[in-house]
Amino acid sequence: MTTGPGRDARELCAIADEALTEAAFCTGEFGDAERLFAEAEAMATRDGDREGAALAAGGLGMTHHYRNIAKLVTGDAVADADVAAEEDLMRRALARWQETDHTAGAARGLFGMGLVFQVLHRDWSAAMPYFWQAFGLAEAMEESGDRYGRSEVHRHVGFYYLVEDVRPREAVRQLEHSLALREQLGDPRRIPSALVSLGDAELVAGNTARAVDLLRRAVPMSHDAALLPWRIADAEQSLSQAEAAARG
């Protein structure tokens, strides 16, 4: 992937973010995203662009995060060095955002740290202080143009109410908001996983028919978007469980 001359760090981050989305949802190949974010970070640091440097560090952190998720879902252990690398990048991004007055950026940085503790350390009590702060700033994320970022915040708060502080109705509410934001964004790669999460929550809440409807949308959309095999399998498994529950 080539980027052409004359781009600044934030433009490079936008290209890197598209490469990351394609890798995380469709190809599993993270090399381009990692290279582009690293190039953007070096450029921003050279130019004294604090916001660009924060954005690039967060992008590198998210690249590591999605790569680590790919290991977890296939049953592989995430090496301690990989956990440490992701956490270091997320901390660096948050520290840089906190040096600016960029509210949406601070929300991104806080959310990234929440992911480290929720997903890698499996520690909701450590994750939620970060997630709650990001939740309080989520509107600023959308106002800055980061609708997907806001969707992710609502998604993980929804997970909290689904599996930790179990309140299925609140989980449904948060995951509905997350899905609506992704539908507004219109990226077909990002909608199926939101349908799956909401379908799973509706099933737990006892709304079996709605769960089946949501998951019957998710499965063909996953195939149409050529998502990664594990993402398609996740949608298909959730649909099978919901249909079994509907049959009683």
Predicted segments — roles?
Residues 7, 12, 32, 52, ...:
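Structural signature of alpha-solenoid helical repeat junctions
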Residues 19-32, 64-86, 115-128, 161-170, ...:
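Short coil/turn connectors between adjacent alpha-helices in alpha-solenoid helical repeat scaffolds
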Residues 14-26, 52-66, 104-119, 148-159, ...:
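Conserved alpha-helical positions within TPR/SEL1-like repeat arrays
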Residues 33, 39-40, 86-93, 112-113, ...:
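Tetratricopeptide repeat
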Residues 145-176, 180-183, 189:
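Alpha-helical adaptor scaffolds
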Residues 4, 37, 44, 97, ...:
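Eukaryotic all-alpha helical interaction scaffolds
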Residues 170-237:
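Ankyrin-repeat and related helical/solenoid repeat scaffolds used for protein-protein interactions
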Residues 1-80, 219, 228, 235-241, ...:
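Flexible inter-repeat linkers and adjacent short helices
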